[in-house]
Structure formats: structure tokens, C-alpha cells
């Protein structure tokens, strides 16, 4: 929302990535220049306005007129009720309370998708494929606490991020083992989405299924425990769970690539994959990604990148704000 759209080149701009646990704030002091990043625990502030004011005081920022917040929520209107924290607020009332000319909110994964367009090559690790086709659609998928899914389509005004809830599409099992895991999940949940498996909790669910099948102990493990034991070769069952997780990610990523025609590349965000880069390069991900019968050659050409940048949500919020101010 903007009350005086004429002076839209002003810096610094306030950008934030707000989750259920922490709110990350920063200042964009020039195009694509992010400074003074700070992480504030959400629980220490009664309202989002209180957290913003605390950051502005802490950073010594003055003259901030424009802001964009990426938030772990769908943005469906002026009223925002966070699903994983108690903050609830009106965007317009918050803008007025902070004395801003502009305040826009966007879904956090939409922001991560936009950040892809500003990510330098040093913050990307390629896993197979050839060179991306310039201006072709890009697919963005991010397993973490949940499963974020987006896409980027080029327009005369620049890159447009597709806001959706693709992580909640139905998961398609590939082989007999995945059918068994899918059935185990189906017995626990009414609908088995891709996110049920391609998330931290999903990795635990895959392990739980394998442990139940083999009557192995421990019956359950945390995602970090599974990853650690798998990478340190301490548990064949954990390694199997991680292999299946990566194969499933290959299936879902290739489905998204085919749906979007993502010859501009597939970009993997989220907190899980960057913790196992060496393993991931040779994991079942890439072979499963290309295993699409008649479209194997089509997918073999598509590059996949692991995004390694530290604060993609903040960079994406800055990109969204820049796009907004260009067009008001």
C-alpha cells in the first residue's frame, strides 16, 4: 500500500523476512545492497510494529519511507493473521503507525523465488543439466519446515513470481517402496501431499515408515539426527531414508519443471539441502529428476541449482519492493 507514490527512489528501504520464530530485518541502502541485517525473536515483541521500531532504533536508521515484509503466510487482503505466531495486524494500519509511504507484504516463498533473479553465481551450486535458456520460466522449490513451491515467468516489466500452494499437491509415489511409504502416510493423514515427505517432518516420516517395516529401533528420529547418522554412515536405515527423500524431491521437482516448461532452470531453496551438499551431488535426486520416459532428454538439459545465499527472503522482499515502486 502506498500513500505518496511519487518519491519512490528514496533509500534506505526497510526489508524483512518474518517467520514464526524470528524476524530478520535489514536496510537496502542502494539497489541490491543489503546492510545491517539483524535477527529479532518474535516472542519478545507484542506486535510486528514493536519489532520494527526496535530494529529501526537498533540500526539507527532514519528517513525510511518504503518497506516490504516477506512473511510465512498467504497474503489474502489487508488483514494478516500469522499461522505460526500470535501476531495479527492490518497492513494499512501498520503502514500508518510506522509513518511509511509504502508497505507491501508478500508470502515468504514468493520472496525467495524473486531472490533467485538476484542471486550471483557464487551462491549457486549446479547439480547436472546444461546452461539455462535465457528468459525461459524458472521453477523454485524449497524443502524446509514445509515445502515452498513457486515459479518465475519473465514479462516486459521483469520477472514475475507465481504465488501458489504447490507443496500441498498430491504426492505421486514412483516405485513399490514409495507406495508403501505413501500408504503409511495415508493411514495417518487424509491427504498425502508432497510436503508430507519433502520437509523436515517428512524426512522423519520416511524414516518412521522404514523403521516400522523393519521393526527397527529407534522407531522415530529428528530430521537432524537422520541426516547426521546418514552422512556419517552410522545407520543404513537413515541413509536409505535420505536417499528416498532426495529421490522424491527429484520426482516433484521434475513434475514442476515440466508443468512450467522451466528451461531457465530449477532452483532448490530451503534449509535442508544446503546442509548436505557433497552427498546431494551424487544422491538419487538427479537420476530421478530425469527419469520421465519420453521427456528424459528434455529434463536432462535443465540445470538444477542449490541456492546458497544466506538471506534470500530479505533479498526477495527488496526485489518485490523495487518492482512495486517502479510501477506505481
Curated annotation (Swiss-Prot):
Q: Which GO terms describe its cellular component?
A: cytosol
Q: Please name the GO terms of the biological process aspect recorded for this protein, alphabetically.
A: glycolytic process
CDD domains documented for this protein: ASKHA_NBD_GLK
Q: Where in the cell is it found?
A: Cytoplasm
* Gene3D superfamilies (UniProt xref): 3.30.420.40, 3.40.367.20
A single MF term (Gene Ontology):
ATP binding
PANTHER family with a match to the protein in the record? GLUCOKINASE (PTHR47690:SF1)
Name of the protein in question: Glucokinase
Q: Which organism is it from?
A: Neisseria gonorrhoeae (strain NCCP11945)
**Gene designation per UniProt:** glk
Amino acid at each position: 500500500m502506498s500513500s505518496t507514490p511519487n518519491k519512490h527512489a528514496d533509500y534506505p528501504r526497510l526489508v524483512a523476512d518474518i517467520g514464526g520464530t524470528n524476524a530478520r530485518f535489514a536496510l537496502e541502502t542502494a539497489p541490491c545492497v543489503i546492510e545491517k541485517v539483524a535477527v529479532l525473536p518474535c516472542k519478545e515483541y507484542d506486535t510486528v510494529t514493536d519489532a520494527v521500531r526496535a530494529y529501526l532504533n537498533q540500526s539507527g536508521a532514519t528517513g525510511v519511507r518504503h518497506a516490504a515484509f516477506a512473511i510465512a503466510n498467504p497474503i489474502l487482503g489487508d488483514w494478516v493473521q500469522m499461522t505460526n505466531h500470535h501476531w495479527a495486524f492490518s497492513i494499512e494500519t501498520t503502514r500508518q503507525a510506522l509513518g511509511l509511504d509504502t508497505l507491501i507484504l508478500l508470502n515468504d516463498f514468493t520472496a525467495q523465488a524473486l531472490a533467485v533473479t538476484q542471486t550471483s553465481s557464487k551462491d549457486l551450486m549446479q547439480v547436472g543439466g546444461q546452461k539455462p535458456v535465457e528468459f525461459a520460466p524458472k521453477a523454485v522449490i524449497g524443502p524446509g519446515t514445509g515445502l515452498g513451491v513457486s515459479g518465475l515467468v519473465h514479462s516486459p516489466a521483469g520477472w514475475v513470481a507465481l504465488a501458489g500452494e504447490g507443496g500441498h499437491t498430491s504426492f505421486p509415489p514412483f516405485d513399490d517402496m514409495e507406495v508403501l511409504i505413501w500408504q503409511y502416510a495415508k493411514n495417518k493423514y487424509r491427504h498425502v501431499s508432497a510436503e508430507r515427505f519433502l520437509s523436515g517432518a517428512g524426512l522423519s516420516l520416511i524414516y518412521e515408515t522404514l523403521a516400522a517395516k523393519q521393526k527397527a529401533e529407534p522407531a522415530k528420529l529428528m530430521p537432524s539426527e537422520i541426516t547426521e547418522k546418514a552422512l556419517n554412515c552410522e545407520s543404513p536405515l537413515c541413509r536409505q531414508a535420505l536417499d528416498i527423500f532426495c529421490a522424491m524431491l527429484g520426482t516433484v521437482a521434475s513434475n514442476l519443471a515440466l508443468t512450467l516448461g522451466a528451461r531457465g532452470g530449477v532452483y532448490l531453496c530451503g534449509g535442508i539441502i544446503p546442509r548436505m551438499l557433497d552427498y546431494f551431488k551424487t544422491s538419487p535426486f538427479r537420476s530421478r529428476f530425469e527419469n520421465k520416459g519420453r521427456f528424459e532428454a528434455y529434463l536432462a538439459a535443465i540445470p538444477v541449482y542449490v541456492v546458497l545465499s544466506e538471506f534470500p527472503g530479505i533479498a526477495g522482499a527488496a526485489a518485490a519492493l523495487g518492482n512495486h515502486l517502479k510501477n506505481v
